[in-house]
């Protein structure tokens, strides 16, 4: 039985019925602290609660997102903490390991190769294994990889399900599709009537670019493409126009990457020379960079100045039949490599390494590296510094941490040396216990006078002990023969000053400054002083000219040449004769008072 319908209240005598027994309460004042609601307690993190953790582990996997779904939906992203150890054979550097994310890729020969040279990608028909960077690959086998074994190239098929729509066309593509031209095919008669679809026409379109295609070229070798070697004149003519302009390929910290090979061929399509400008880490080993440029591109480095390389394409280069490689669509994740800094490096104990690190804190750096600079002489400077000290430090303030770590790894292999620390943006290196000097004799920074220039007394020459001491204290000359000769001439002409060890130890900074100031004044006087030459124009007074000879004249009246008098060379005599002839010509050709300066002097004298 349904309930009875609600009855309306009876109207009051005053008129309408009062629906509210009492007036509604006032709205709460949000500014009054009495009416404010208390803040809700913070929500606890779900991952920190042990109950939620147990519930998450006990929960069965979702069938829609499990292993049975499409691999595209369960692919790891940038925030995924992925780390997979490589096979032991590849980690030990004894061989290669092939990794493939899909069985079909492995059957087609598409795989990720992990070996002693790092991470590379193998495609069928490719002349070599592709890498992200060819010149900056570490010389140590990786320990683990940070992403699944996916190839960074366009796949031959699209296994991913379609989840979007076709991309929008650009203005150029729309204009290209609208650009049609009517024509009649060659060899056929023109249609008499027009069909329902119109007359025959051809639509202009861009050739589809196959990003996964590998074309090794026309099969010619690198020597056949290069042709005959260039002469010096041809190299000069090719390089000169490219020195000033900035149409170039810039190589940075990643070195020669895979996609730069396509850029080099794009430069070669319009010009014979590709100018490559290198900065940063790759300039530490320019020889390695030039090798990979020639090996991977097929060109020839014909000129190099500092960090600028000029790459020649070859006499028989054809851009239509050049090799074509697929482009990398993204940068692969860098594998995990062994640590560069170890607590106890090779050949040292932990206590010895800690002591060297403490000594390195007070050591002055040999140089300061600039950001994106050119470091072509860094290896040579480090080797020279190891001749005088067992520890060397390089200041890398302002550089990217990955940059100076790569520089340290290169120095470890090229110098070679032992890396101790990267603290405070500085590279600290030890030359190693098995280090051997490049010179047979010890190094000194003070040039020594040769033995044949030092006078030896009879007692010293006859003493065997003195001879033994000389052989034992024989010091190698740091300077080259030409530079040593210049130093010797400078000391003899009082332009340079050499201090002995005793004088150096006795000098204080103030006395050294005073000594340098006094010597600078003396050297300037010697340098700017010239012998005076007296020329007498009065031939009627021969006594003035012969006054200096009267005292030395013998009684016979003939002049005898002195024993220590130097004879004048033929070249000097010819020069004097030439100067006398020039003076006679000037005196005979220009009369007195004919020059403009003579008029000025006369006017000044009159005033």
From Swiss-Prot:
Highest taxon listed in the record's lineage: Eukaryota
GO cellular component term of the entry, any: ribonucleoprotein complex
Alphabetical list of InterPro entries matching this protein: CAF1P_plant, RNA-binding_CRM, YhbY-like_sf
All residue ranges annotated as the CRM domain in the record: 228-324, 346-442
Region CRS2 binding, residue ranges: 482-505
Segment annotated as transit peptide: 1-79
Function: Required for the splicing of group IIB introns in chloroplasts. Forms splicing particles with CRS2. Interacts with RNA and confers intron specificity of the splicing particles.
Keyword Cell inner membrane in annotation: no
Sample GO molecular function, one term: RNA binding
The UniProt record lists the keyword Repeat: yes
Taxon lineage: Eukaryota, Viridiplantae, Streptophyta, Embryophyta, Tracheophyta
GO biological process assignments: Group II intron splicing; mRNA processing
Keywords for the protein's UniProt record, in alphabetical order: Chloroplast, mRNA processing, mRNA splicing, Plastid, Repeat, Ribonucleoprotein, RNA-binding, Transit peptide
Pfam family of the protein (one): CRS1_YhbY
Region (Disordered): 1-75, 550-576
Name of the protein described by the UniProt record: CRS2-associated factor 2, chloroplastic
Quaternary structure annotation from Swiss-Prot or TrEMBL: Interacts with CRS2 and RNA. Part of large ribonucleo-protein complexes that include group IIB introns, CRS2 and CAF2.
